[in-house]
Amino acid sequence: MPFMHGSMPLRRTFFYLQQGKVKLRDNVNVFSMGFHKNPTPEQSGARDFVYWNWAQLQYHNPKVQLVKHADKVVTPFARAYLNDGREVLFDLDGMKREEIEKLLAKTLGKTELVERREHLESIAKLNPADFGSKNERQCMCEVQGQHPCTGLLRAPQCVTGKYRWNHNLI
């Protein structure tokens, strides 16, 4: 397989995808980037950013549409379309991959406070499979298709735990 040579498999690992630093805000709908596949040395930062960071952008921003414009532009650029109809345009000519990453994280990215809050909310989110007084469902019998409570209906003798079919075991 041609994509499994060189640095290609590294970019597909789960650990590498989690290392992405650009987590776009919720008001970003579309993010597009124009670059050259065979750039001049001043324009190579945009191509390198797409090569190394595009998969991380897709992983961390599943609700954002990401568009690449390869070899269709004169100078490399990035453009973000926001919810309210505004556009944010970045000129990436002469910037390196790390500079582009910092620029996008600072202007379009979530702040550390927002990221920390979302992380704590995801931890505290109640699991719908949990049962008990602090959860949505009090008992397993409230789920459709499950056995009713033994308080409402007598359980079969083989389910109660008091029934032993082989008395010679003990």
Curated annotation (Swiss-Prot):
GO terms for cellular component: mitochondrial small ribosomal subunit; mitochondrion. Keywords: Mitochondrion, Ribonucleoprotein, Ribosomal protein. It is found in: Mitochondrion. The keyword Mitochondrion applies. Coiled coil: none annotated. It comes from the Eukaryota. Component of the mitochondrial ribosome small subunit (28S) which comprises a 12S rRNA and about 30 distinct proteins. Belongs to the mitochondrion-specific ribosomal protein mS25 family. PANTHER family: MITOCHONDRIAL RIBOSOMAL PROTEIN S25, SMALL RIBOSOMAL SUBUNIT PROTEIN MS25. This is Small ribosomal subunit protein mS25.
